[in-house]
């Protein structure tokens, strides 16, 4: 049998930090209004770095930490909804930037579930026995997608990237997974709608900005996502008590509070960093994982059992249980 494992982690955020007070100077909001409803205090915003630039920093960090050459990589997957361009992909740009000439590379679009979907995909590549090493990165520059006159969305999002090195292993580390999509509810969270514009079509509508039905997304997370997490835990033949940490998409502190109660786990098992990053979509889980390793909460090769769960646009949601 062929198995995959997470052997290294890394993250990167733009230097510019924008606080709630900074936002209050350009829109009708306040630190109290934002933090009491979301838990967010700050977010990193790019001034000149693209999504592929952020992802490249993560890739370089992963290679430096692991001591492997870029030419040893078999694949690079970048989960993002904010690529530099429709083509070439952000992953292709990363491949060129780091000189990973032997790696195939592609982007995966599943919004805030993107890293989970991408990590599952990378695990399948390695478990096939055909590939040995790959990078899975979540990278976003969401600051270019928000309407900065809309306080209901502009205050929520930030820019950043995080990722992991996947390598072949002799023992099983990916214990259970579940992935879902419900396109019938897709209009509750949208971004980057591109209308038809050829000489042979009616002019379509363009909607470049992110739009969200906040209540619908909150209810979706507490209901559908919580249920799927419970089912994934059950399928692994583990209990919630067996999990060392649950790394959930960093959308809202209230979601984490309610999730802990619904799942019957100590709130301390759900670390949070949206206070400093805001919602970074596909980047949120790998950034959180990398910070937990930096802080010593999670130890690489420490045989800890970690649940990761993402949820967002599509609607999409997915959960992985792994040992690290």
UniProtKB/Swiss-Prot annotation:
Residue segments, region ACP-binding? 250-254
- EC identifiers of the protein: 2.3.1.180
Q: Which GO terms of the molecular function aspect are on file?
A: 3-oxoacyl-[acyl-carrier-protein] synthase activity; beta-ketoacyl-acyl-carrier-protein synthase III activity
Main localization category: cytoplasm
Active site, UniProt feature: 112, 249, 279
Protein origin, superkingdom = Bacteria
Which CDD domains has this protein been placed in? Answer: KAS_III
Q: Which GO terms describe its biological process?
A: fatty acid biosynthetic process
Alphabetically sorted, this entry's keywords are: Acyltransferase, Cytoplasm, Fatty acid biosynthesis, Fatty acid metabolism, Lipid biosynthesis, Lipid metabolism, Multifunctional enzyme, Transferase
Q: Which reaction does it catalyse?
A: malonyl-[ACP] + acetyl-CoA + H(+) = 3-oxobutanoyl-[ACP] + CO2 + CoA
Q: Name one GO cellular component term.
A: cytoplasm
Cell compartments where the protein resides: Cytoplasm
Which pathway does it take part in?
A: Lipid metabolism; fatty acid biosynthesis
Q: Where are the transmembrane segments?
A: none
Taken from the record, one Pfam family name reads ACP_syn_III
Q: What domain notes does the record hold?
A: The last Arg residue of the ACP-binding site is essential for the weak association between ACP/AcpP and FabH.
The job of this chain, per UniProt, is described as: Catalyzes the condensation reaction of fatty acid synthesis by the addition to an acyl acceptor of two carbons from malonyl-ACP. Catalyzes the first condensation reaction which initiates fatty acid synthesis and may therefore play a role in governing the total rate of fatty acid production. Possesses both acetoacetyl-ACP synthase and acetyl transacylase activities. Its substrate specificity determines the biosynthesis of branched-chain and/or straight-chain of fatty acids.
| Assembly description | Homodimer.
Query: So what family is this one in?
Result: Belongs to the thiolase-like superfamily. FabH family.
NCBIfam families per record: fabH, PRK09352.1
Report what the protein is called.
Answer: Beta-ketoacyl-[acyl-carrier-protein] synthase III
Native organism is Streptococcus sanguinis (strain SK36)
- Provide the taxonomic classification: Bacteria, Bacillati, Bacillota, Bacilli, Lactobacillales
């Amino acid at each position: 049998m062929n198995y995959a494992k997470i052997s290294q982690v890394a993250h990167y955020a733009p230097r510019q930090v924008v606080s709630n007070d900074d936002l209050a100077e350009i829109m009708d909001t306040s630190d109290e209004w934002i933090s009491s409803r979301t838990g967010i205090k700050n977010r990193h915003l790019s001034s000149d770095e693209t999504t592929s630039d952020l992802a490249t920093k993560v890739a370089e960090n992963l290679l430096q930490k692991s001591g492997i050459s870029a030419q040893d990589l078999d694949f690079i997957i970048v989960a993002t909804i904010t690529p530099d361009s429709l083509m070439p992909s952000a992953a292709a740009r990363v491949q060129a930037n780091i000189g990973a000439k032997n790696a195939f590379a592609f982007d995966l679009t599943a919004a805030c579930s993107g890293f989970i979907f991408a990590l599952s995909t990378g695990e399948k590549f390695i478990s096939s026995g055909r590939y040995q090493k790959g990078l899975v990165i979540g990278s976003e520059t969401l600051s270019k997608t928000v309407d900065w006159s809309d306080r209901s969305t502009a205050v929520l999002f930030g820019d950043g990237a995080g990722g992991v090195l996947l390598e072949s292993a002799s023992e099983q580390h990916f214990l259970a997974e579940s992935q879902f999509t419900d396109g019938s509810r897709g209009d509750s969270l949208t971004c980057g709608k591109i209308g038809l514009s050829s000489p042979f079509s009616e002019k379509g509508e363009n909607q470049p900005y992110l739009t969200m039905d906040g209540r619908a997304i909150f209810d979706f997370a507490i209901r559908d996502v919580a249920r799927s997490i419970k089912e994934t835990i059950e399928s692994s033949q583990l209990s919630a008590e067996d999990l060392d940490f649950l790394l959930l998409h960093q959308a809202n502190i209230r979601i984490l509070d309610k999730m802990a109660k619904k799942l019957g786990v100590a709130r301390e098992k759900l670390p949070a960093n949206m206070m400093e990053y805001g919602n970074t979509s596909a980047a949120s889980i790998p950034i959180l994982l990398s910070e937990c390793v930096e802080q010593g909460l999670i130890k690489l090769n420490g045989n800890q059992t970690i649940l990761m769960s993402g949820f967002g646009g599509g609607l999409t949601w997915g959960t992985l249980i792994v040992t690290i």
